[in-house]
Design a protein with these regions (language model features):
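Start-transfer (signal-anchor) and selected internal transmembrane alpha helices
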Residues: 1-33, 127-130, 137, 143, ...
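Membrane-interface transmembrane helices that cradle and orient dolichyl/undecaprenyl
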Residues: 6, 139, 178-194, 204
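Transmembrane-helix signature of polytopic, membrane-embedded enzymes
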Residues: 19, 24, 132-154, 187, ...
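Catalytic lumenal/periplasmic loop and adjoining terminal transmembrane helix
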Residues: 35-41, 251-255, 260-271, 342, ...
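Multi-pass, polyprenyl lipid-linked donor-dependent membrane glycosyltransferases
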Residues: 45, 117-124, 143-154, 158-177, ...
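Transmembrane-lumen/periplasm boundary regions of multi-pass, lipid-linked membrane glycan transferases
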Residues: 50-64, 89-92, 98, 203, ...
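Transmembrane-helix motifs of polytopic, lipid-linked glycan transferases
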Residues: 119-139, 177, 181
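Hydrophobic/aromatic-rich transmembrane helices and adjacent perimembrane loops
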Residues: 168-171, 204, 213, 297-310, ...
Length: 535
């Protein structure tokens, strides 16, 4: 990014060495942390379809490499059969599934299939953490880089998505890298920056429709900071080459690229009609479109308070010189862009912070800048041991609570709420969605289900029957259990996605004591009930 840091970090090779060590250390720490409990997070609603799709990609690749009829493998019919499988719940372009197929092929035998698939988002997350540390350190110094990486690592909901084999962590990492490369190319040119921007943008496009929006906040930023014509030319050059990358990595586009693009855009813009997903927000259920302030409120109540304060500090201290603070300006534009995007009438906004996850690395950078400003202020007043003690106290005040909360919330990362709303109990009382993606159906809970339910038990499940059939297919849930999606049955398992509750689920949830429950700080996330219909 910019060449002049706000704080002194050394010069030349020494400075570069420390940035490299910081980035590598942050990425390694992220990898070790997530690896330690990646198997503890429940298999999420979408993952079984992605597992199946990745397995089909593995089989197709094996046929292409060593099969007897390689020509037919490349036919439009065979490609559509494999790469367009399960479009209703598996509509996204394939890069994240290709990554899952690769990591499971490499490590599945050693780690198990689920952990092998989940290695892909973990690697993307580690790369993202290292990149955030690098950018923060390059722009504002080592303190900023380290604090930015720590801030992102200590956002429980972001950390949770690093455990889950889905689109969200890959597109978040690729969005950040594409933005980083594009800004660097606009400001300084260079083959490396261009290559980073092109490949990251191309892969983002082929991961999720969201990837197509990468240039929008960059253009808005360039209108303020780089109005010369060369900026537009640079963005267009990157976009054109990125489309070529997207074409190469998406076999569905090989035979009919225009039709593939049209279908992707159409599916993405019609989600409210084809697959409306309900959300519980501030005590009301919304079938698809939420109030405009949902993304803003969710940001404020799902990021640890210390990190929010540092982010506000970093933003506020940059405002007087924001015209010269190009990275801070970019971060502000990125966060506001996602808030504005999700406020639009036709934008999907379900599933907590999942659909605007790419905003959080930029918020983390602002927090890193805030930490750098705190240390700079201390340096003006203190020296030696006093400075060290004060800096340590700052870390404790701003980051230690976030660390303790993140550790305590495991493995229910996606249910985290901060003190502004009263934590998890306060969020439940104020009518927020407490869980949504089946991540609370942990291996430990499934094991207890297997112990409690009698042989050949009939079990109705809400809101999804297919999810538990998939658990049986994965060997997690006993296969003699008969799964139903209709009552009456002797047993009823309710997942606490309250936006989808009918009056039946509300009555059971409020009035009946479960046989087995998943609880977080006194709030029920899932419960197994004996069903006794009332007359």
């Amino acid at each position: 990014m910019l060449e002049t840091p706000m704080t002194e970090t050394g010069s030349g090779r020494t400075d570069l060495m420390w940035r490299m060590l910081l980035s590598l250390g942050a990425a390694t720490l992220a990898f070790i942390w997530v690896s330690s409990d990646v198997a503890n997070v429940g298999i999420t609603w979408d993952e079984p379809a992605y597992f199946s799709s990745a397995t089909r990609i593995q089989d197709w690749t094996a046929e292409l490499v060593s099969g007897p009829d390689r020509v037919s493998v490349l036919s439009a019919e065979r490609i559509e059969e494999v790469w367009d499988w399960g479009r209703t719940w598996n509509p996204h372009p394939p890069v994240y599934k290709e990554a899952m197929a690769l990591t499971e092929w490499v490590a599945g035998d050693a780690l198990g299939s689920v952990r092998g698939f989940r290695l892909a988002p973990l690697l993307f997350f580690s790369l993202l953490i290292g990149a955030v540390a690098w950018v923060g350190a390059r722009e504002w110094g080592l303190v900023a880089g380290g604090a930015a990486a720590a801030a992102l690592l200590l956002m429980p909901r972001v950390l949770g998505h690093a455990h889950i084999a889905a689109t969200d962590m890959p597109v978040t990492a690729l969005w950040f890298l594409a933005t980083l490369g594009t800004i660097r190319f606009i400001e300084h040119r260079g083959v490396g920056a261009y290559a980073l921007a092109v490949f990251a943008f191309g892969l983002a496009i082929s991961t999720k429709f969201t990837g197509f929006l990468v240039p929008v906040p960059i253009v808005l930023w360039a209108l303020v900071y780089h109005r010369r014509k060369g900026s537009v030319t640079a963005i267009v050059a990157i976009g054109a080459a990125a489309l070529a990358v997207a074409y190469l990595v998406n076999p569905l586009a090989w035979h009919q690229p225009v039709d593939a693009l049209r279908q992707l855009v159409g599916d993405s813009l019609r989600r409210g009609d084809s697959v409306p997903i309900a959300t519980y927000y501030l005590g009301a259920s919304y079938s698809f479109k939420l109030p405009w302030h949902h993304a803003i409120v969710m940001t404020l109540v799902t990021v640890p308070i210390g990190i929010l304060v540092l982010g506000l500090w970093g933003t506020g201290s940059a405002l007087p010189r924001l015209r010269r603070e190009t990275l801070a300006g970019l971060c502000v534009v990125e966060v506001i862009f996602f808030w504005a995007l999700l406020a639009l009438p036709n934008s999907p906004n379900h599933d907590g912070v999942r659909l605007f996850l790419p905003a959080f690395p930029f918020l983390a950078l602002l927090a890193g800048r805030g930490a750098s400003e705190v240390v700079t202020a201390l340096r003006k007043r203190l020296r030696g041991a006093e400075l060290g003690l004060a800096s340590a106290c700052g870390v404790i005040v701003f980051l230690l609570p976030a660390y303790l909360q993140t550790v305590a919330i495991s493995p229910y990362y996606l249910s985290y709420y901060n003190e502004l709303i009263g934590g998890v109990p306060g969020a439940e009382q104020r009518g927020m969605e407490m869980t949504y993606w089946y991540d609370a159906i942990t291996p430990a809970f499934v094991e207890r289900l297997n112990e409690i339910l009698p042989p050949d038990a009939e079990l109705a499940t809400f809101p999804s029957q297919d999810y538990f059939l998939a658990l049986q297919g994965l060997g997690r849930l006993r296969d003699d259990i008969r799964i139903s999606d209709t009552l009456p049955t002797p047993y009823y398992l309710i997942y606490g996605r309250r936006g989808m509750f009918t009056p039946v689920e509300w009555q059971i949830y409020r009035d009946v004591r479960p046989l087995l429950t998943v609880e977080l700080q006194g709030v029920e996330l899932a419960g197994l009930y004996r069903y006794q219909p009332t007359d």
